[in-house]
Amino acid sequence: MQEKTLTESIDAALSSIGEASRTTQPEIELRENGVVTTVLNGIALIRGLPGVGYEELVEMSGGVYGIAFNVDPDEVGVVLLGEYAKLQAGGRARRTGRVMDVPVGDGLLGRVVNPLGRPLDAEGEPRFSGRLPIERPSPGIMDRNAVSTPLQTGLKVVDAIVPIGRGQRELILGDRQTGKTAIAVATILNQKGRNVICIYCAIGQRASAVAKVLAQLREHGAMAHTVAVVTEGNDPSGLQYIAPYAATSIGEYFMEQGRDVLIVYDDLTNHARAYRELSLLLKRPPGREAFPGDIFYVHSRLLERSTHLRKELGGGSLTALPIIETEAQNISAYIPTNLISITDGQIYLSPTLFELGNLPAVDIGKSVSRVGGKAQLAAYRSVTGRLKLAYAQFEELENFARFGTRLDEASRKAITHGERIRECLKQDELDVLGVEEQILILLSLSEGQFDPLELSEVSGAMKRLSAAARELPRDLLERLHSDRPLSDEDRRRLLQTAEAALQKKRTAGRL
């Protein structure tokens, strides 16, 4: 009896195994596994991954990731991302079958993250809506719209002389410690309440410098509309290299939703150096200044992603402010000339003007905006044309007067007027002004109302004009912010307001 029961149990078990084998389809997955042969200064050399693709993400022992940069038949050169101290030769490596991507979404607003999307602000993991590749093709020609809307920086010299439009790429360049980052930060602060998303991308910056910028943004309430993507100087070169691409993908997410985005790359000099270091370690042929031959393409494919999309695609825009550091005022060096040719204009900051206290130290003669003028508000165009000409004449006469030449009355008046223009274009760091304040000051300046004042009185006069501008009638404010030129009646009302504000000081002085 027991034998029969045992036999039946065995038969039933074998039958179930047979049935399972007929219905079960085993899943076989082929994976390429390689071996790390060399780890050196932020790169790794791997053997045994013959099918890996260019810029494919590679996972190595200890959870270290890298991007395949050199794809040779026998060996793959991988740029390491993140901490790699525990990675050693002999470690395992495998393909992931995907490219590097970054988390995107509204949950990143107000956060400080690294290019991998990992938080640096001790506020926990950020909420995100999805992921986008860090390398994306730039919009086609037929997907773009003309730059037609101004992006106000809050700085008189920029908004009046070298205006920036939404979707433009405006280079900021100058020697170290001349106020390049200050202009970019002021522009971010001025977007508060203007429905513009801002992205600050720090590339290989000192931790103290980044902390200062973030403190300024928080102090002025600008972090609510800002995402900070940060790499420090001690981060691996690979992480510094991907930082601007990751930040741009975050910005493109908002742009494709029809929103306006401003992105600051601080700075692309460090980015170029990081790419040069990686290329030399991977034994790529060096070119001019030891940079690899494709350094122009590295930056052009990044900046071409900034644009103003046509209405059918949402009408969003991505405005780029790349920053470049020059050496000894040499703007004809390799990287600066590359960026000047890629961008739509440049703002050059002169160390000479900086040392003289003319802040922001914008050299008007070497600064230009190739497309922003078409986006500038009409009220600016009504007042800045004469200012540019007067200032150019003043600079020429000032150089001439240094030789001790006696000047006629007209020349002396031109110098007096030019000195007031230069004084009016000065602005304290992060002290941004609204459109109505700038236009009232510039109109009063162009009409010579500042000429009777002493230079020491100009700063106080501008403050009184700013206060008066904030009290202008609503209908006049709306016209100043519109694209309609100033009418004769508008000019008369503005000049009366300016004269009344300036008269207060004179009356107070007589009393």
Swiss-Prot record:
HAMAP family (UniProt xref): ATP_synth_alpha_bact (MF_01346)
Subcellular location: Cell inner membrane
Family affiliation: Belongs to the ATPase alpha/beta chains family.
UniProt cross-references to SUPFAM superfamilies, sorted A to Z: C-terminal domain of alpha and beta subunits of F1 ATP synthase (SSF47917), N-terminal domain of alpha and beta subunits of F1 ATP synthase (SSF50615), P-loop containing nucleoside triphosphate hydrolases (SSF52540)
PROSITE patterns xref list: ATPASE_ALPHA_BETA
EC code: 7.1.2.2
Feature type site, description Required for activity: S367
Organism: Chlorobium luteolum (strain DSM 273 / BCRC 81028 / 2530) (Pelodictyon luteolum)
UniProt KW Translocase keyword: yes
Name of a matching Pfam family: ATP-synt_ab
InterPro entries given in the database record: Alt_ATP_synth_F1_asu, ATP_synth_asu-like_sf, ATP_synth_asu_C, ATP_synth_asu_C_sf, ATP_synth_F1_a_nt-bd_dom, ATP_synth_F1_asu, ATPase_a/bsu_AS, ATPase_F1/V1/A1_a/bsu_N
Gene Ontology CC entries for this record: plasma membrane; proton-transporting ATP synthase complex
Name listed for the protein in its UniProt record: ATP synthase subunit alpha 1
